[in-house]
Each structure stands twice: as structure tokens, then as C-alpha cells.
């Protein structure tokens, strides 16, 4: 569930005694999770959205899939809920510079190369810290906004050139409006 009204939608569905407090930014910060109940469906809500907007991933037993979707759609009418597809979600994540496994993230790029060093605390010990500090950083993932020809259709894996030399590769691409 993602978007500016996602919190209100979840508040309307949860069985909590004080849902506003449960879903407050102080009690439910970004990248945290809580066990909640939606109409007696045990649900793990994770405060993260692939779109970069306010949102939650909902994890629940698969046998409740249809029931939960029906509840979300019914209650979602009051919040102008719209279903979106994977391409829309992918374009939204690109606009927010979110990285995707298989595109920007993979076995060949460390967090620094992926542009995610803000998630590394070098003041703490962690597995691989020494190797990461010694690693020769050869590339860096950055977000480019290209104001180019209207017939340009970037998708991913295209080479990036400067002065006739390949200087990188596009990992993801798409249009933004």
C-alpha cells in the first residue's frame, strides 16, 4: 500500500485500540515493522514502499490473499485507491532513485558502488567491514535525468558514452512526467 492516503487506509482497517498512535511516525518509523491485525488477519506491516512514497508492505498468510484484497479495495474506495502495475511501480522507484535487485543491485556491486553508503555505519563492526574498507571502488551508481530527444527510449543495459568512449552503462530507464 503506497501513497499519501496509505496510512489513513490502514488506520481504517486495523483492529488496534488506538490506530492513529500505532501508525504514528514516532511509533512506526521508516524501515520498521509491526505485527498488526486487519479484520482478524495476522499481518506483518513493514514501513517501506518501493515507490519512495509513504507506504507499507503487508505480509500475511497466503490463504488470506483474496479476503485482504477485497477488504483493501472496499475500504480503499473512501481513499480513491487505485491499483497500479509493476511498470508504474518501477518508474516511481526510478524517480526516487531507489535501487532494484538485478538492475542496480547484485553480486558485482557493493553498497558504496550502488550509492547506498548512507546505510553503512563504519563506527560499528559488521561482517565484511574490512573487505569493504579495502575494496577498490571502480564505479558508482548515480541517477541521471536526461532531457533528450523524444524518440529516446532508455530501458536498461545501454552503454553511456562520453567523447566516443564508454564510461558506464544504464541499469534502469524510463520516462518521467
What are these regions (language model features)?
Residues 1-177:
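Conserved, structured C-terminal
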Amino acid at each position: 500500500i503506497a501513497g499519501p492516503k496509505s496510512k489513513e487506509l490502514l488506520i481504517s482497517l486495523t483492529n488496534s485500540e488506538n490506530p492513529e498512535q500505532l501508525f504514528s511516525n514516532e511509533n512506526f518509523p521508516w524501515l520498521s515493522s509491526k505485527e498488526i491485525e486487519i479484520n482478524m488477519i495476522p499481518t506483518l506491516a513493514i514501513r517501506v514502499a518501493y515507490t519512495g512514497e509513504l507506504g507499507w508492505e503487508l505480509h500475511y498468510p497466503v490463504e488470506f490473499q483474496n479476503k485482504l484484497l477485497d477488504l483493501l479495495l472496499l475500504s480503499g474506495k473512501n481513499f480513491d485507491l487505485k491499483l497500479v502495475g509493476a511498470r508504474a511501480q518501477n518508474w516511481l522507484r526510478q524517480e526516487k532513485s531507489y535501487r532494484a535487485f538485478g538492475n542496480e543491485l547484485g553480486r558485482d556491486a557493493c553498497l558504496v558502488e550502488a550509492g547506498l553508503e548512507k546505510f553503512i555505519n563504519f563506527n560499528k563492526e559488521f561482517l565484511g567491514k574490512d573487505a569493504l574498507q579495502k575494496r577498490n571502488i571502480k564505479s558508482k551508481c548515480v541517477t541521471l535525468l536526461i532531457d533528450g530527444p523524444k524518440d529516446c527510449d532508455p530501458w536498461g543495459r545501454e552503454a553511456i558514452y562520453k567523447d566516443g568512449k564508454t564510461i558506464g552503462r544504464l541499469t534502469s530507464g524510463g520516462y518521467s512526467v
